[in-house]
Amino acid sequence: MTIAFQLAVFALIATSLILLISVPVVFASSDGWSSNKNIVFSGTSLWIGLVFLVAILNSLIS
């Protein structure tokens, strides 16, 4: 169970870093928002799901 928690935390951190870099780049590009809107929303949904997964796994471990 601890390994699953650690992998979920790592995935959350990696997703956060990817979104931290990619979202400003998408907004700064000329037509990036209209063509990459679905990717940004998918990444945000993944991030929210990982937050809940980490919270659930944390409650099971401690």
Swiss-Prot record:
Q: Where is this protein localized, as stated in its record?
A: Plastid, Chloroplast thylakoid membrane
Specify the protein's topology with respect to the membrane: Multi-pass membrane protein
Q: GO biological process: any one?
A: photosynthesis
Q: Name the keywords, alphabetized.
A: Chloroplast, Membrane, Photosynthesis, Photosystem II, Plastid, Reaction center, Thylakoid, Transmembrane, Transmembrane helix
Span-the-membrane segments of this chain are 8-28, 41-61
Which GO CC terms are listed, alphabetically? chloroplast thylakoid membrane; photosystem II reaction center
SUPFAM superfamilies per UniProt = PsbZ-like
Q: What is its main location?
A: plastid
Under NCBIfam families, the record lists: PS_II_psbZ
What family is it from?
Answer: Belongs to the PsbZ family.
Database matches in PANTHER family: PHOTOSYSTEM II REACTION CENTER PROTEIN Z
Q: What does this protein do?
A: May control the interaction of photosystem II (PSII) cores with the light-harvesting antenna, regulates electron flow through the 2 photosystem reaction centers. PSII is a light-driven water plastoquinone oxidoreductase, using light energy to abstract electrons from H(2)O, generating a proton gradient subsequently used for ATP formation.
Subunit (UniProt):
PSII is composed of 1 copy each of membrane proteins PsbA, PsbB, PsbC, PsbD, PsbE, PsbF, PsbH, PsbI, PsbJ, PsbK, PsbL, PsbM, PsbT, PsbY, PsbZ, Psb30/Ycf12, at least 3 peripheral proteins of the oxygen-evolving complex and a large number of cofactors. It forms dimeric complexes.
UniProt-recorded name of the protein:
Photosystem II reaction center protein Z
Q: What organism does the UniProt record list as the source?
A: Phalaenopsis aphrodite subsp. formosana (Moth orchid)
**Upper taxonomic classification of the species?**
Eukaryota, Viridiplantae, Streptophyta, Embryophyta, Tracheophyta
Q: Name the gene behind this protein.
A: psbZ
